[in-house]
Amino acid sequence: MGSAIDFDLDGHLDILGQQPLLQMYTQICFAFPVADSSSYSAITKTLADGLERLSASFPWVAGHIVNEDSGEGNTGVFKIKPLDKSPSLIVKDFRNDPSFPTMEAIKKAGFPFSMLNEDIIAPRKTLPVRSDTPEISPVLVVQADLITGGLLLVFAGQHNAMDMTGQGQVIHLFSKACRNEPFTSDELVSGNLDRRTLVPLLDDSYKQGHELARQISQPRPPPSSDGPPPPKLDWTYILFSPTSLAELKSLAQKTITFPSSFISTDDTLSAFVWQAVARSRLPRFDASAKTTCARAVDVRSYLGVPSTYTGLLQNVTYDTFTLQKLVNEPLGSVASALRSGLDPKRPNDLGFSTRALVTVLSRTLDKNTFSFGGTVNPSLDFMVSSWAKLDSYELDFGLGLGKPEGVRRPQFQPLESLGFLMPKTQDGEIAFALCLMEEDMKRLRADEEFTKYGVFVG
């Protein structure tokens, strides 16, 4: 399989991974059909053996996250420490549980949130809960859910240690390990890079500027016991077929305003959903209220870091419109605005702003001061992250089951205004995960302009 690159686990997490608000797990579920029920024992053995091979070459994936030297006004240091020989593989068998849906039923329903609850199918909750937060925070945990006619394979990656791009690469490497394929020298190097010096700091002359203004954490008032109950929130998946995506992009290309004359499918779909969310909110807000799209971006290419780097290296772009302007703008104009935030030629581009954030974090004892969410107002703003480029639908993990038929993030605690583009299927479909207030979601479901292209599956 190739040998691991020698490195010291102690202090292995990079500076971006030192943010306490990243103490959470990112989950992704692969759904496979299983025709022969006698194959489950071979499946679990393949997975267990694959985790051992993965850990032999990338030992940090078998570690756990610890925090050291924290105290009053000091969030301490997050590190990866050795834990086990390999990440845990949890196996749960739901085949005799009549309340658990079959693979056929889940597929027929479109792999909805309602059938993929993290409390049941995932090895860790996304967000920490004081009453049940485990003392140990493994870097990676895998759960194999055996269901009638299928397998749900769920990965939970600790967010201080990896973003979704990094986690996607870890899963890609795990699939190779399950197939007993050797890792390339490039994979071994990029998967074991020393994270501490990966992003060069700005020199001592740098003074914090407006490029970080959006990432200063804003204290939120505690909920009042005398106030109204919090609004009910709803998660849903919306499916966009290859035809719908092509039509949306063609429509957007007619009104591009960014000089490069290029917008991506991600730009277009993110803009389309943001505009629709704004329309759903107009009845509740003044049309002059401002809304911001906070878009997570993989910044590896801006910093000369390999695309296969398995850690955390992301930042966020921010675009702001009034609600009225946003809903009235042509789709191409909004998509162009989102694209312009990725331009490496613009002043204070993502490379510089990421180095600035890393520099300031390195100088700051209390790293709760900064977060990617920063000034985001969930009631008005929109946070979106794209997993569309992950090769999830190409992975078979050597299980003899073929490629996955569905890849989804399991349902977790509702977070208003959060959206994800799921990995693109082999035929080009994208499932968009979205969480809104129930009343906004109801208006979105009735929005004919939106439902012309997107199909709700829940």
Swiss-Prot record:
Instruction: Name it.
Output: O-acetyltransferase dmxR13
Known pathway: Secondary metabolite biosynthesis
Q: Which InterPro entries match?
A: CAT-like_dom_sf, Sec_Metabolite_Acyltrans, Tri101-like_N
Enzyme Commission designation: 2.3.1.-
Is this entry keyworded Transferase? Answer: yes
| Superkingdom as given in the UniProt entry | Eukaryota
User: Acyltransferase: is it a keyword of this entry?
Assistant: yes
Q: Where is this region: Disordered?
A: 211-231
UniProt lists the family membership as follows: Belongs to the trichothecene 3-O-acetyltransferase family.
Q: What does this protein do?
A: O-acetyltransferase; part of the gene cluster that mediates the biosynthesis of the dimeric xanthones cryptosporioptides. The pathway begins with the synthesis of atrochrysone thioester by the polyketide synthase dmx-nrPKS. The atrochrysone carboxyl ACP thioesterase dmxR1 then breaks the thioester bond and releases the atrochrysone carboxylic acid from dmx-nrPKS. Atrochrysone carboxylic acid is decarboxylated by the decarboxylase dmxR15, and oxidized by the anthrone oxygenase dmxR16 to yield emodin. Emodin is then reduced to emodin hydroquinone by the oxidoreductase dmxR7.
The Pro residues compositionally biased stretches are 219-231
| Lineage summary | Eukaryota, Fungi, Dikarya, Ascomycota, Pezizomycotina
Keyword set for this entry?
Acyltransferase, Transferase
Taken from the record, one Pfam family name reads TRI-like_N
One annotated GO molecular function is: acyltransferase activity
Q: What happens when the gene is disrupted?
A: Abolished production of cryptosprioptide C and D, but retains the production of cryptosporioptide A, however, in smaller quantities.
- Kindly report, in one word, the top-level EC class recorded for this enzyme: transferase
Gene that encodes the chain: dmxR13
